[in-house]
Swiss-Prot record:
It comes from Salmonella arizonae (strain ATCC BAA-731 / CDC346-86 / RSK2980). The keyword Cytoplasm applies. This is 3-phosphoshikimate 1-carboxyvinyltransferase. The gene is aroA. InterPro entries: Enolpyruvate_Tfrase_dom, Enolpyruvate_Tfrase_sf, EPSP_synthase, EPSP_synthase_CS, RNA3'P_cycl/enolpyr_Trfase_a/b. SUPFAM superfamilies: EPT/RTPC-like.
């Protein structure tokens, strides 16, 4: 297996222009495809997940052109539901941001489509979304294991009264919200259980509004969506930088700054993961906010005990930042780590122990006590981009770290290690 050994880093200092947000990129692509008119998306993320969405849209007959660097996409909208040409099978890799919204969107009309993906995708639950779509009339079959992809979709979704379980993934609610305006009937969506990752729903609602559709949101417990609507292109749309990707650089600044400044997000960002900066500040770092940047300056870091339900992806970065904090850090209410690209709770606990940390892994929490000195270890990445990027922070100690399968960062940030090196001074 390919590996990358990062030598100890003495100091980080500088600015990083963030790649486009994965969450925003794939939502914007799908809405542009469903909309009337031509949309020009700029600062689009070039990554595996976005390529899977683009390939699917192409197979569904959507016309688009990409710039040479794949960060600008001119897309001609369909002016309504996507139409599958005959029997179509779409391979979506391990891209949850493509699988879940497309599963809902392709239930409009009378298409017949199969959605499949990598082996890990077949372990990521989709049953709650399927149950909700069936309540709205959708005809869906599981082709292998009940409640998991691959799926055969035969259209039929018309709207109506729907319940969705919000406790596993906010992507299920996102998928329903984006599809419901195009259904013939009005849709009332009631959320069961605690809604995880609520800020990601705000991203969805913000983008829907940009494309001309507004809905009634009753305290995130009930959403009322008028049927028979159309999305309309906003013309040009700038994809803001990826706030989850910002977390690694901001954490590096907190640990070994200097000051690290990330541009492309700021105090006005729609992404909930900008709240990661507040967590670093609580730990002892100094944060400066601008409209289009966040900067982090080193501070003496102290352990925290926090509910991380609102920023589950960025919370992973706190788990490795905890290696540099005084005391025992506890991250709570993170059950949905278990249904991401890998079982992230298990993976994080396993790899933190390799570098010498004392770790308690609960069903929905992790407790981390750093060692007096970090150990050099080969870090398994579980084909999970965030595991690779989180554990790069170990190099901010006086100990090297070896990252196995470093190219797994292609899911969201193909040149991550080059960008980290650019702001780093070797020890």
């Amino acid at each position: 297996m390919e590996s990358l050994t990062l030598q100890p880093i003495a100091r980080v200092d500088g600015a990083i222009n963030l790649p486009g947000s994965k969450s925003v990129s794939n939502r914007a692509l799908l809405l542009a495809a469903l909309a009337c008119g031509k949309t020009v998306l700029t600062n689009l993320l070039d990554s595996d997940d976005v390529r899977h969405m683009l390939n699917a849209l192409s197979a569904l007959g959507i016309d688009y052109t990409l710039s040479a660097d794949r960060t600008r996409c001119d897309i001609i909208g369909n002016g309504g539901a996507l139409r599958a040409p005959g029997d179509l099978e779409l391979f979506l890799g391990n891209a949850g941001t493509a699988m879940r919204p497309l599963a809902a969107a392709l239930c409009l009309g009378q298409n017949e489509t199969v959605l499949t993906g990598e082996p890990r995708m077949k372990e990521r639950p989709i049953g709650h979304l399927v149950d909700s779509l069936r309540q709205g009339g959708a005809n869906i079959d599981y082709l292998e294991q009940e409640n998991y992809p691959p799926l055969r979709l035969r259209g039929g979704f018309t709207g109506g009264d729907i319940e969705v379980d919000g406790s596993v993934s906010s992507q299920f609610l996102t998928a329903l919200l984006m599809t419901a305006p195009l259904a013939p009937k009005d849709t009332i969506i009631r959320v069961k259980g605690e809604l995880v990752s609520k800020p990601y729903i705000d991203i969805t609602l913000n983008l829907m509004k940009t494309f001309g559709v507004e809905i009634m949101n009753h305290h995130y417990q009930q959403f009322v969506v008028k049927g028979g609507q159309q999305y309309h292109s906003p013309g040009r749309y700038l994809v803001e930088g990826d706030a989850s990707s910002a977390s690694y650089f901001l954490a590096a600044g907190a640990i070994k700054g200097g000051t690290v400044k990330v541009t492309g997000i700021g105090r006005k960002s729609m992404q909930g993961d900008i709240r990661f900066a507040d967590v670093l500040e609580k730990m002892g770092a100094t944060i400066t906010w601008g409209d289009d940047f966040i900067a982090c300056t080193r501070g003496e870091l102290h352990a925290i005990d926090m509910d991380m339900n609102h920023i589950p992806d960025a919370a992973m970065t706190i788990a490795t930042t905890a290696l540099f904090a005084k005391g025992t850090t506890t991250l709570r209410n993170i059950y949905n780590w278990r249904v991401k690209e890998t079982d992230r709770l298990f993976a994080m606990a396993t790899e933190l122990r390799k570098v010498g940390a004392e770790v308690e892994e609960g069903d929905d929490y992790i407790r981390i006590t750093p060692p007096a000195k970090l150990h050099h270890a080969d870090i398994g990445t579980y084909n999970d981009h965030r595991m690779a990027m989180c554990f790069s922070l170990v190099a901010l100690s006086d100990t090297p770290v070896t990252i196995l399968d470093p190219k797994c960062t292609a899911k969201t940030f193909p040149d991550y290690f080059e960008q980290l090196a650019r702001i780093s001074t070797p020890a």
